[in-house]
Amino acid sequence: MDLLLISLTTIIIAAYMQNLRRRGSNIPPGPPTRFLVGNLHQLKPLWTQSFSEWSQTYGPIISVWLGSQLAVVVSSSDLAKQVLRDKDYQLCNRHRTARMTQNGSDLIWSDYGAHYVKMRKLCTLELFSLKSIECFRSMREMEVSSMVKSIFNDFMSDDQKPVVLRNYLDSVALNIVSRLVIGKTFEPKDGREFRSIVERETRLPGATKMLDYTVWLKRLSSWFTSDKAFMKHMARKRNWFKRAVMDEVYGGRDQKCFVQSLLELKEKDELTEETVMGLVWNMLTAGADTTAITIEWAMAEMIRCPTVKEKVQDELDSVVGSGRLMSDADIPKLPFLQCVLKEALRLHPPTPLMLPHKASESVQVGGYKVPKGATVYVNVQAIARDPANWSNPDEFRPERFLVEETDVKGQDFRVLPFGSGRRVCPAAQLSLNMMTLALGSLLHCFSWTSSTPREHIDMTEKPGLVCYMKAPLQALASSRLPQELYL
């Protein structure tokens, strides 16, 4: 017991002295802290809300203490440009926690360096080049067509039963991504298991966040048996699922896919087993989430704003007509549909708080010091709703993108759904194509009305790394095209 007390005292004193040293430097201002836990106790379930509120008080660059870890949060487009372009090299490492980060052996959570560059180049060549996107066009169209047919068959059996759109969006997104990555679609049961694992991982309990960021709690984490058990349980489920996927792949696939290329490199000793599984997990989780989340928000906004929905449908009727389904080739001819998607990405970025960067050396941002080792967050949602950048920023107005051509793939720092700089999402163009095709097909094939009064649609966000609607969108569907197109 005496040894435990001495150890605890030593850890607390060390943490206190470390905080004192850091606070003495010219770091950004921020809210008052509590000893040992910093600002963790003040954070709302939606961290972006807390960061946005503090930015209103302390300015667009703030310091937030996540236990003993300093986090610098930027909430303006000018400061985002400094972090993601001007000081990108010094700030492009990853802050990794004990959970869900693959030990940095994958792409998303690896530090910037030779491994990251190699993995990114591999993913780009195999999956995200314009040639690859075009090569898999018919597959995307086939999966979206299957989604349309499923919706039609379901509502035909009971046209007064609301459609829970998320069920179909999750399935089509996962099917497209899984066919790209592993050359097959999941069985329904496996797909549900996959989505369950991902959802629970992105919404871990509060105590786990405390353990992630508080050094002295990490060292005494044996006290938190239930939380540790949860993390171990999720790690086992994740590893079991990845192993099951890899076993399927090792069994042989006739169709060329991403993981086959990885295995060829593995046989040449250029990749480890851990890296192969990490990359597969990255591609499956990131690709499926972004598509389903964005389309659900876009549909919710349009059902709340029927004039926008009707304008998109008029455009679709003019370009596609009523004798066939929408194809990828139609996308360039549908500017207003593209504007709707951009506006949905602006108001509801799939990752409202950019995944954490880490300073590899001390740098100046916005006139303040960002110390080496500090975590750096870009508050994507706050920037996208900044009245300095957008008129009526909280309103759904797709036409704003007709007036001004705006890039959403990392070049315009006012809207950053895919990040920017060395860490920009390599799948941005593929994601945009998938989302535009799926969203356009839903609007072209069906008329949509709310199953409740429009003003009662719950637009609350669900806490987590990614931004799902808290209450899944439900709507009534009716067909707009000749019946033979749905068969």
Curated annotation (Swiss-Prot):
Belongs to the cytochrome P450 family. Its cofactor is heme. It is found in: Membrane. It is an enzyme of class 1 (oxidoreductase). Its EC number is 1.14.-.-. It comes from Arabidopsis thaliana. Heme binds at residue 425. GO terms for biological process: spermidine metabolic process. The keyword Metal-binding applies. One of its GO terms (molecular function) is monocoumaroyl dicaffeoyl spermidine meta-hydroxylase activity. Pfam families: p450 (PF00067). PROSITE patterns: CYTOCHROME_P450. This is Cytochrome P450 98A9. Strongly expressed in root tips, inflorescence tips, young flower buds, stamen, tapetum and pollen. Detected in aging vasculature. Keywords: Heme, Iron, Membrane, Metal-binding, Monooxygenase, Oxidoreductase, Transmembrane, Transmembrane helix. InterPro entries: Cyt_P450 (IPR001128), Cyt_P450_CS (IPR017972), Cyt_P450_E_grp-I (IPR002401), Cyt_P450_sf (IPR036396). GO terms for cellular component: membrane. The chain crosses the membrane at residues 1-21. It is a single-pass membrane protein. It comes from the Eukaryota. Its main location: membrane. Acts redundantly with CYP98A8 as tricoumaroylspermidine meta-hydroxylase. Involved in phenolamide synthesis, but a recombinant CYP98A9 is unable to hydroxylate triferuloylspermidine. Unable to use 5-O-(4-coumaroyl) D-quinate or 5-O-(4-coumaroyl) shikimate as substrates. The keyword Transmembrane helix applies.
